[in-house]
Amino acid sequence: EDFALGFSLSEGILRDKSELYDIEIVQQLDGIELRMDVATESFVKLKEKRRNLVGRTGCGLCGAESLAQALRLPVLDDSKQEASKNDALRANIHAASRALITASSIESAFANMQVKQVLQKATGATHACAWVNMDGMVEVVREDVGRHNAMDKLVGALAKAPQQQAGFVLTSSRASYEMVQKVAMAGLDILVAISAPTGLAVRLAEAYGVTLVGFLREHQFVIYTHANRIKV
């Protein structure tokens, strides 16, 4: 359910969780089928996207006919960008995510998320995305074989949750442009990645007002964009 809601929000299919009326989870031999009942306006929007939205473990331009189609967010000034962010998460955590975070909280998150990665410990084959509070403690974590899926699960979990504490998103993967885009679509402001960001991810983060941090280690990290949200 977290994935279904989060994917729909981060892909712009739904603007708010209230547009998702029901989810039926059907176990299949080779996976899981999600049957979703959504608002008519959202269904029409989905048909107009002309994109194959088959879920995979890792998908960037899958089904998109062009890079322009894949890059869903326009470059906006601050006032318009604020208004464009997803309503579903803005009510829960957008204001909290705008708080100033410290270097020590980012560094603490590195170890704290590893402790929370249950599937990774069992399989050694999963990524994780987490919501981390101002003290560097992991509040919510979601895992998946694919980093994009893990991010969608986190977005869905946060959309369903009550007001979250101030904090930021942490991912165990590299920061691709898709990860930055999903964070921006969800109305979040800070993405911290354990590995490197791509060049396009940095450019999009700068344009969309997302603070992007990469190469997180126990006592160091690199700030790529909008460093004003981090107190070093």
Question: What kind of region is each of these model predictions?
Answer:
Residues 1-129, 134, 138-140:
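Intrinsically disordered, low-complexity regions enriched in acidic/Ser/Thr/Pro/Gln residues
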Residues 115, 119-173:
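Glycine- and Gly-Pro-enriched alpha-helical subdomains that act as flexible
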Residues 132-133, 224-226:
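Short beta-strand-to-turn element immediately C-terminal to the catalytic PLP-Schiff-base lysine
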Residues 147-224, 232:
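Feature captures the catalytic cores and cofactor-binding loops of soluble hydro-lyases/lyases
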Residues 229:
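An anion-binding catalytic pocket shared by soluble metabolic enzymes
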